[in-house]
Amino acid sequence: MLDVKYLRNHFEEVKEKLLKRGEDLTNIDRFEELDKKRRELIAKAEELKNKRNEVSQQIAVLKREKKDADHLIAEMRDVGDRIKTMDDEIRQVEEELNALLLSIPNIPHESVPVGKSEEDNVEVRKWGEPRSFSFEPKPHWDIAEQLGILDFERAAKVTGSRFVFYKGLGARLERALINFMLDVHIEEFGYQEILPPYLVNRASMTGTGQLPKFEEDAFRIETDDYFLIPTAEVPVTNLHRDEILSAEDLPIYYVAYSACFRAEAGSAGRDTRGLIRQHQFNKVELVKFVKPEDSYDELEKLTNQAERILQLLGLPYRVVCLCTGDLGFSSAKTYDIEVWLPSYGTYREISSCSNFEAFQARRANIRFRREPKAKPEYVHTLNGSGLAIGRTVAAILENYQQEDGTVVIPEVLRPYMGNLEVIR
C-alpha cells in the first residue's frame, strides 16, 4: 500500500510512475476525486460540530436564565441529524478510499528499466554454459516417465490437470533438494528456518498484496474464509503483522519450505505438460525484514543467495531485471533468475527476488523503532524463491540427462540420496 500522505502531495508524480507500469489510472483518479470530497465533508462536518458546541453553550445559558430555548434545541436536532448523515457519508467515502488504495500497485524504483512486457526485461548477468548434447535432449516429462519417477497421468485421474505424483527416486530427489536448499540458506547465509501453516486468513493475503486484486488466482476454503498459500511469503511475512520490532533485531532472515497452491487462472494453454506450471508445488522461500536504507543492498544479497543454489547444482542460469511493465503488483524492483532448460532451448524462471520497500509493511502494519522511545517506522520487506523445487527437478533432469535415458545426480545432492550417483 502506498503512503497516503505521499500520494496526496504527489498525485501527478505517482500517476507518471504508474503509467510506466502500463497501469490504468482510473482507480488513482477516483482516489484523488474521493480524497478531495472527503476533505470537504470533514471541513463541513467540523463547521457544524463547532456550531453545535457554540449553540449548546447558548442553550445552557438560556436554561440557567430560565428563558425559552426550544427554537435552538430544535435547530440543534436538525444540525445533529446533518452531522450524523455527514459522518456516515465520510465513513462510506473512507471505505471506498481504502479499497482503492489496496488496488493501487507499488511505485517502481528509479533503477527499474521502463518497458511494456517481459520482452523489455534487461539481462544483468549469466552464469555457466549450456551443455552441448551429442543427442537430441528430451523434455523432463519424457525422461521422468521413462524412469518411472513422475506420474502425471495418475495425478490427473486422482485430482485433475497440473498435478503430479513423485515416485521412488523422484520423490527422493525432491526431498533431497528441499533439505539441501534449507541447509545452504541456514548454514551459509544465517537464515532462521520457519515451517509455516498452509492456510491463512484474508488479512494475511491482503497484507502481502495477493488480495483483493488476485483472489481469482487463489484457492479459498469458503466455510472459514481461509486461503491455501500461494507461497510461504504470505504466512512468513505476516508473522510480524501488527508488530513493532526493534532496530537491534534487524535484519531478520527467514527461510521456509512449503507446498504452494495456485489456481493459475490466466494460464490456460501455457506449459500444459511437465513441472513448470502446477496447481500444487514445493518451494523454499526466503523472506527478509530490513531497515529502509539497507533494502537495496539486501536485494542484491538475496539474489546472490538464490543464485548460489544453482551454482552449487551446476545449472546454467541468467539474471534479468524486470521492466516496469512486467513488475509484480507489490514489488518496487525484481530480479528473476532463469535456469537453462535444453528442451525449451531457452531460460525459464526459477526464482523471483523482490524488494517491496514499505508496500507490504504498510498493509500489514509491520514497524520498527530505531531507539526505545523513537517514533515507529515501517520496515522494508523482501522475498525470493530459494528455489522452486519442481522447476529445479525439471532443470536437473534435462541438464543431467544421458543418452541412455539415465540422469546423473549433481554431486552436492548425493549425500542427501545415500551417495547415489545416477537415477536409472
Swiss-Prot record:
Q: What is its main location?
A: cytoplasm
Which positions are tagged coiled coil? none
Annotated InterPro entries: aa-tRNA-synt_IIb, aa-tRNA-synth_II, aa-tRNA-synth_II/BPL/LPL, Ser-tRNA-ligase_type_1, Ser-tRNA-synth_1_N, SerRS_1_N_sf, SerRS_core, tRNA-bd_arm
Q: Mind listing the GO biological process terms from this record?
A: selenocysteine biosynthetic process; seryl-tRNA aminoacylation
Q: What is its EC number?
A: 6.1.1.11
Database matches in PROSITE patterns? AA_TRNA_LIGASE_II (PS50862)
**Leader peptide range in chain numbering:** none
UniProt catalytic activity: tRNA(Ser) + L-serine + ATP = L-seryl-tRNA(Ser) + AMP + diphosphate + H(+); tRNA(Sec) + L-serine + ATP = L-seryl-tRNA(Sec) + AMP + diphosphate + H(+)
Q: At which positions is ATP bound?
A: R262, A263, E264, E349, I350, S351, S352
Protein origin, superkingdom: Bacteria
Instruction: Name the pathway.
Output: Aminoacyl-tRNA biosynthesis; selenocysteinyl-tRNA(Sec) biosynthesis; L-seryl-tRNA(Sec) from L-serine and tRNA(Sec): step 1/1
Which UniProt keywords are present, listed alphabetically?
Aminoacyl-tRNA synthetase, ATP-binding, Cytoplasm, Ligase, Nucleotide-binding, Protein biosynthesis
Repressor is among the record's keywords: no
Q: Give the binding site residues for L-serine.
A: T231, A232, E233, E285, S385
Per UniProt, the enzyme's principal EC class comes to ligase
Q: Where in the cell is it found?
A: Cytoplasm
Q: What HAMAP family does the database record attribute to this sequence? A: Ser_tRNA_synth_type1
Q: Which family does it belong to?
A: Belongs to the class-II aminoacyl-tRNA synthetase family. Type-1 seryl-tRNA synthetase subfamily.
Q: Subunit structure, briefly?
A: Homodimer. The tRNA molecule binds across the dimer.
As for what it does, the entry says: Catalyzes the attachment of serine to tRNA(Ser). Is also able to aminoacylate tRNA(Sec) with serine, to form the misacylated tRNA L-seryl-tRNA(Sec), which will be further converted into selenocysteinyl-tRNA(Sec).
**Entry note about domains:** Consists of two distinct domains, a catalytic core and a N-terminal extension that is involved in tRNA binding.
Q: Which PANTHER family match?
A: SERINE--TRNA LIGASE, SERYL-TRNA SYNTHETASE
Q: What is this protein called?
A: Serine--tRNA ligase
* Gene transcribed to yield this protein: serS
